[in-house]
């Protein structure tokens, strides 16, 4: 594959984190690259996020797929961001710990619209 094409993809994924649908994954201590997706379904859409970090020296690449989770930014991005933080930092910050607890309490109504 062409290095220039790779650089364009990385720049696009970084842009999505800075000013697009992946904003909630943005961090000041390491650069995250990612892309959301919404897989349409007869019921609630599926939430998808793929990303990697740090941008210039990746240590983790992740794909998150939440069945009936809605838009990619609804569940995929926040869950993926928490997983990357845990892997890279070895633990979650207190605010991320709180966010993880909130996500564990959420209920997804499979097969129905719940937005």
Show where each model-derived region lies.
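Short, gly/Ser/Thr-rich active-site loops of penicillin-recognizing serine hydrolases
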Residues: 79-115
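Active-site beta-strand/loop architecture of penicillin-binding DD-peptidases
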Residues: 3-94
